[in-house]
Amino acid sequence: MSDTAELTTDPTPDLTKGDTITVEVTRPAHGGEGIAHHGGRVIFVRGGFPGDDVDVEITQVKKRFARGFVVQVNVASPHRVDSRCPAAAAGAGCCDYAELSPEAELEIKSRVLTDQLQRIGGLADIPTPELFELEPSQGWRTRVRLGVDASGRAGFRKLRSNDLVTDVACSQVVPELIDGLVGPGARTFTPDSEVIAAIDDRGVRTVVEVRKAPRGRRAETILHVLEGDGSVEQTVGDHTWTFPVSGFWQAHTKAPGAYSAFIGEVLDGAELVDVDKRGPVAWDLYGGVGLFVPVINRALGAHVHSVELSEGSAEAGDDALAGLPVTFHAGRVESVTSQLPKPHVVVLDPPRTGAGSDVVATIAGAKPQLVVHIGCDPATFARDVADWSAGGYTLDRLAVFNAFPATHHYETIGVFTRKSA
């Protein structure tokens, strides 16, 4: 069920691209837009928040919906504030919630998730989301990818554009992360490349030029190491990982610890059955460097099979977690899992595109007693939830982490158990 399905009248035909209309935004939509109505159409309003009365320039017109962006705020939503991000104020697409009150942000994100679970996930009975704010709300990003223009200047991409904002910084970023990389007097780079910069838990900055990763992949190809040795060190609990700066790691400095703590609390309460003398088996899918392996092992005493497409990430995890009962497998989840022992518990953290029907069906076919599913896109997460339901699983708990403050993005963790026969 889409947002346009709620219309009961035929849209008027006179709306065209470039028109300016006045609308009231009534609720949030997935993707950071607000929803309004005009002439029988749903209007998706970029830059609009619930309660806004705004003038909108139309950029796209379809039969039952249109899209546009705010050109003037006539009556401001009570949730609207002055922009919290200089780069976003200059047109960058980094912080699309920069003008949304921090106090309203997580509640609006929760509303969007619930809506997606109803419309796409087909759920009528949704657990009340457990909401987690991650602090700080500014200066939280310790790794960033920058575009580079034809003259070699690095900056933040404008919304749905290859153009860059090169003169001011984004408020997400730890200030010292981009000192000398963005803004007046910054160094230049290879034109039309991309730059990854990261500050790790040692306080060491690494800067590399990369070739952009293919869609759906987490790792870039490093072309030049410009600062540091091309690797980063990250520590959670008693374990330290060393891996290439282009490898995947959570963006918010507090996210790894927060997710690990929640997963640990879930698994601590698990009552597993049919466990033989060798102990339980757990799958850690899309596991990266094995961030969640220690907490899985600590909570369950399980042997963990961690599956990750990137061979470099799997090797980094193997090095960091030597001595723990874990086996790393480099390969595609859908290929490797058929060779693994049946799991009692599965933790999976798929990319933004989601796990997909085939992977969910494969996992469900292995009949784990408990599944912890991490999602960073509410629409694909909701689609996966529908597949879990079809595979015989019930969504018992739902957590929302505001891990990307001032943006429409957030992290969701769903806890699933097998339905009773």
Swiss-Prot record:
Active site: 376 (nucleophile)
Listed transmembrane segments: none
InterPro entries documented for this protein: MeTrfase_TrmA_AS, NA-bd_OB-fold, SAM-dependent_MTases_sf, TRAM_dom, U5_MeTrfase_fam
Gene Ontology terms describing biological process: rRNA base methylation
Class of the enzyme per the UniProt entry, highest EC level: transferase
Keyword Iron: no
EC number(s) from the headed UniProt entry: 2.1.1.-
GO molecular function: rRNA (uridine-C5-)-methyltransferase activity
Keyword set, alphabetical order: Methyltransferase, S-adenosyl-L-methionine, Transferase
Record-annotated TRAM domain positions: 14-72
A Pfam family reported for this protein in Swiss-Prot or TrEMBL: TRAM
Superkingdom of source: Bacteria
Residues given in the record as S-adenosyl-L-methionine binding sites: 250, 286, 308, 349
Signal peptide (UniProt feature, chain positions): none
PANTHER family: RNA M5U METHYLTRANSFERASE, TRNA (URACIL(54)-C(5))-METHYLTRANSFERASE
Family stated for the protein in its record: Belongs to the class I-like SAM-binding methyltransferase superfamily. RNA M5U methyltransferase family.
Protein name, UniProt field: Uncharacterized RNA methyltransferase CE1797
Species of provenance: Corynebacterium efficiens (strain DSM 44549 / YS-314 / AJ 12310 / JCM 11189 / NBRC 100395)
